[in-house]
Design a protein with these regions (language model features):
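Conserved helicase motor core of P-loop NTPases
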Residues: 1-176
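C-terminal accessory regions
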Residues: 131-268
Length: 268
């Protein structure tokens, strides 16, 4: 990913052998590291890059990488708020990342892929064997396949335990059924699961019954970023330092530092 003129080359070479505990600015013609100590400045710089990404419809322009899911969720909420400066759930141009595979009307949403919100319309989603729910008919753009498709996305307040209980009840009934009744119950289960997407994990009794289909796509875990490349990467090294195992820390540092094609801004 880095050229011979990248200032990150020697850093990556070191990270192949051992983790790094002291970080400093490092500039190169084709790639530089900028260390930032203030979270506010780190987020402000990231927002500037995301504004370009949204304008250019370039989902591989920039990404924030962190270690923990909690930190990723906090970044996604913060960047969403800073970008749009209102309380609306969705906006035209919003970047959404898929957190599960989902098939609908011939289109397939792929786990860990980014999608761009082209338009959305408030609607009522008829969730079979449950009730009618508030939601949105969202038109998403798939940059990789140069195609658009629509998905039914539940409003956040509809992603609750009541729905999780219905899903788990039907699933349990299907598991415990026999013969034709078993086949029928599984058909009911898949009809239900295929009727909507969610922006939140659905829980009951402390267990995740269904993972979120989509979340905001501004920040992801370093683990989820493997295999991806971005023009610019923002790394929360403070969060990555939570990994106390030496080899785990080295791997996280190497993966995060090698995602960029040019520059890295690091929070330390």
């Amino acid at each position: 990913r880095q050229s011979e003129k990248s200032g990150l080359k020697d850093i990556l070479q070191t990270l192949r052998e051992s983790p790094i505990h002291q970080w400093n600015n490092c500039e190169g013609e084709d790639g530089s590291l900028f260390v930032e100590s203030k979270l506010e400045n780190f987020c402000r710089k990231a927002v500037s890059e995301f504004k370009y990404e949204i304008e250019a419809k370039d989902i591989l322009h920039t990404k924030i990488l962190a270690y923990t899911n909690t930190r990723v969720n906090n970044y996604n909420k913060a960047i969403h708020k800073l970008l749009w400066n209102d309380d609306n759930f969705l906006h035209k141009g919003e970047i959404l990342m898929a957190y599960e595979n989902f098939k609908k009307d011939g289109y397939e949403v792929t786990n860990s892929m980014d999608y761009i919100v082209e338009e959305f319309t408030p609607t009522i989603i008829d969730v079979p064997y449950y009730t009618k729910c508030k939601g949105y008919l969202v038109k998403l753009y798939d940059e990789y396949n140069n195609a658009s498709f629509k998905i039914p996305l539940l409003a956040p307040e509809e992603c609750n335990e009541d729905l999780a209980i219905v899903i788990e009840t039907i699933r349990t009934e299907a598991i415990n059924s026999q013969g034709y009744d078993r086949k029928k119950k599984w058909s009911i289960y898949y009809d239900l699961m295929g009727s909507f997407c969610t922006s939140k994990d659905l829980f009951t009794d402390g267990r995740c019954i269904r993972k979120a289909t989509f979340k905001y796509g501004y920040a992801i875990t370093t683990h989820r970023s493997q295999g991806s490349s971005y023009d610019n990467v923002f790394i929360d090294m403070k969060d990555i330092f939570r990994a106390k195992d030496k080899e785990t820390l080295r791997q996280l540092q190497y993966v995060s530092m090698s995602r960029t094609r040019s520059d890295i801004t690091m929070l330390l």
